[in-house]
Amino acid sequence: MTAALELTGVFQHVGQRCALAGIDLRVPEGAWLLLVGRNGAGKSLLTRLILGLDTPSAGGVRILGQDLQSLDSRALATLRRRLGVVLQGGSLLEDRSVIENLVLPLRGRLGGRPQMARAARLVIASLRLDGLENLLPRSLSLGQRRQVELARALIHRPDLLVWDGLSDGLDPAAIFDTLAVLRAQRVNRPLTLIATDNRADALGDGCDQVGVLERGRLIFHGPPKALDAALPQRLDLRYVLTGRP
């Protein structure tokens, strides 16, 4: 099966510290991977490498069949048009309304303003964000902001969605709605999802693979049902990731 993501021997140094050490990872097209670990384990740093925002100190990163290190700025920009991205810290334009933020990825792709506005309203409705279209981001709660960021990441139907901090700011009902939208997107096309969180159950039963990062090392990568057996002596880590002793 074609790989949506391949990491080979990836190292990343931050100053004198080795923040990521020898990461090997392969995610098939259409699979859902949840990267989990405690704060500081390297999840966000790895996300930035996957997106080409940082360059690894050593090793290779391939996204949707393309070697990131071999791409010039124009080719990288073209590749990123196939990605949907939700990062921690937020990326909404504070002086633009919700609907203006949502249509940004559609410029040059989907007709004129009426078509773009219709697409934005459809994704707003799917996430139950009706009534927020004309508000500025500063008027939104943290959970609403995160969902608007997700809506913007999905509006152009990306091949790969990268979501750093899956449950950040979202209550259980919002997480349920969000996962329902992602499952619907997955029905007719191979949407690949790479998400990060502190908990291994964040994706529910939609998760195909779990990767566990601990101090910059990938100590487990496999199906969720194999996680407990893979960490028999790490009761502290297992409790943090699953809530089970």
What do these predicted ranges mean?
Residues 68-84, 230:
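ABC ATPase NBD coupling module
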Residues 161-165:
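Catalytic Walker B motif of ABC-type/P-loop ATPase nucleotide-binding domains
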Residues 136-140:
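Conserved ABC ATPase signature
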Residues 157:
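Conserved catalytic motifs of ABC-family nucleotide-binding domains
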